[in-house]
């Protein structure tokens, strides 16, 4: 009998902020998703599929500095 891709439903790990009550009651995470979760320190937003959390209201400079160090200029790379 050949293996069929997708015969079992995909399961995602439980993340911090996920309610175990919703998971135990049998509700799917996408059905119970409100789009926003509140935290006393910061605002969290869940993607439509409830797979990831994003922090809202963070300046773009924070994301830019988190990505990678700035590239060196051509003068620094090729000294004379």
Swiss-Prot record:
<feature type="compositionally biased region" description="Polar residues">
    <location>
        <begin position="33"/>
        <end position="42"/>
    </location>
</feature>
<dbReference type="Pfam" id="PF14982">
    <property type="entry name" value="UPF0731"/>
</dbReference>
<feature type="compositionally biased region" description="Low complexity">
    <location>
        <begin position="15"/>
        <end position="32"/>
    </location>
</feature>
<feature type="region of interest" description="Disordered">
    <location>
        <begin position="1"/>
        <end position="45"/>
    </location>
</feature>
<comment type="similarity">
    <text>Belongs to the FAM229 family.</text>
</comment>
<protein>
    <recommendedName>
        <fullName>Protein FAM229B</fullName>
    </recommendedName>
</protein>
<dbReference type="InterPro" id="IPR028025">
    <property type="entry name" value="FAM229"/>
</dbReference>
């Amino acid at each position: 009998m050949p293996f069929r891709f997708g015969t079992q439903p995909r399961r995602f790990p439980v993340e911090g902020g996920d309610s175990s009550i919703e998971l135990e009651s049998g509700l799917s995470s996408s059905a119970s998703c409100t789009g926003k979760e509140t935290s006393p320190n910061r605002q969290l937003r869940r993607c439509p599929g409830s797979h990831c959390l994003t922090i809202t209201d963070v300046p773009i400079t924070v994301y830019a500095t988190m990505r990678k160090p700035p590239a060196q200029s051509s003068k620094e790379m090729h000294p004379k």
